[in-house]
From Swiss-Prot:
Gene Ontology CC annotations of this record: cytoplasm; ribonucleoprotein complex; ribosome
Signal peptide: none
GO MF terms, alphabetically ordered: small ribosomal subunit rRNA binding; structural constituent of ribosome
Primary role: Binds together with bS18 to 16S ribosomal RNA.
Protein's name according to its UniProt entry: Small ribosomal subunit protein bS6
Family: Belongs to the bacterial ribosomal protein bS6 family.
NCBIfam families in the cross-refs: S6
């Protein structure tokens, strides 16, 4: 197998990711669910899925982020392709309700 074929096959494989999203505390529950549904649809388009979703709830931030001292935390474990993660990051970056987010690839050693 050529190196380029190997790289392409590795890039397109599903990988395990953990995603933490911190939302503003005044975000309505319906909007939280809409954001999670949007993430789910994005990864489902490329055969991915959530394996676990935990609402950690309202917590104090370690430091102020903008004007926010508290945030509503959501922790997600999922199987997704890297291209899905790039789209999720772009979507979350422009959302007004998202204070901060981070996706981590759990497959890397």
């Amino acid at each position: 197998m050529a190196a380029s074929e190997l790289l392409k096959s590795r890039v397109e494989n599903l990988r395990d990711y953990e995603l933490v999203v911190i939302l503003t505390t005044d975000t309505p529950k319906e909007k939280v669910e809409a954001i999670l549904e949007g993430i789910s649809k994005t990864i489902a388009e490329k055969d991915g899925s959530f394996t676990e979703v935990n609402h950690w709830g309202k917590r104090k931030l370690a430091y102020l982020i903008g004007r926010y001292g508290e945030g509503y935390y959501v922790f997600i474990k999922m199987k997704a392709k890297p291209s899905s993660i790039r789209k999720i990051n772009a979507d979350l970056r422009i959302s007004e309700q998202v204070i901060r987010h981070m996706a981590i690839n759990m497959d890397e050693e």
